[in-house]
Amino acid sequence: MSYTEKPDEITKDEWMEKLNNLHVQRADMNRLIMNYLVTEGFKEAAEKFRMESGIEPSVDLETLDERIKIREMILKGQIQEAIALINSLHPELLDTNRYLYFHLQQQHLIELIRQRETEAALEFAQTQLAEQGEESRECLTEMERTLALLAFDNPEDSPFGDLLNMMQRQKVWSEVNQAVLDYENRESTPKLAKLLKLLLWAQNELDQKKVKYPKMTDLSKGVIEEPK
């Protein structure tokens, strides 16, 4: 007689019980947090966390100062100043990472458009970005999308308004931060981010195999849903 054996399933309650019984050393968690703060350049938070947890950072926190200045400039929209500081720290970085340089130049163009400096934006695009657009289809597409903002009286409300959001500046800063850390042969991705990517990969593998399991659906809040 043949029969189909029902696969093992685990409920959310069972899963949560297993998680609650799993012992993770507080020091290990603290090291993950410190690693994140240092990698992302949060010096003040890292200093305070060192005092509270007793965990020493893997690098001298004073070495974060220049990255912090670059971050502040980019998040304020001071792109040309950020480029100048990057060049003073690592003169070859933007020469060897042309996409990063393009994205910084693109962000400067976005800032000109934000300030409604239309003529300056068009001149900058023609003199500084056109050549890269000719060399790369990807750059051309991004440049066209950016210039499309000029077609709207209120570009913030246009289909391309996301370029004017703070998240766009944050995106550029994250790219710069990773490039600088890579250039300095430092860890450029926080260990916590790697663990979250591993979690997403594992869940995707289970989904592909049609496995029913308690799934984390919101990483920011740690929301776990019942198996479906």
Curated annotation (Swiss-Prot):
Core component of the CTLH E3 ubiquitin-protein ligase complex that selectively accepts ubiquitin from UBE2H and mediates ubiquitination and subsequent proteasomal degradation of the transcription factor HBP1. Acts as a positive regulator of Wnt signaling pathway by promoting beta-catenin (CTNNB1) nuclear accumulation. One of its GO terms (molecular function) is protein homodimerization activity. Residues 63-120 form the CTLH domain. Disulfide bonds: none annotated. Residues 25-57 form the LisH domain. Keywords: Cytoplasm, Nucleus, Ubl conjugation, Wnt signaling pathway. GO terms for cellular component: cell junction; cytoplasm; cytosol; nucleoplasm; nucleus; ubiquitin ligase complex. The gene is GID8. GO terms for biological process: positive regulation of canonical Wnt signaling pathway; positive regulation of cell population proliferation; proteasome-mediated ubiquitin-dependent protein catabolic process; Wnt signaling pathway. This is Glucose-induced degradation protein 8 homolog. Belongs to the GID8 family. It is found in: Cytoplasm; Nucleus. Polyubiquitinated through 'Lys-48'-polyubiquitin chains, leading to proteasomal degradation in the absence of Wnt stimulation. It comes from Bos taurus. Residues 116-212 are annotated as: Interaction with CTNNB1.
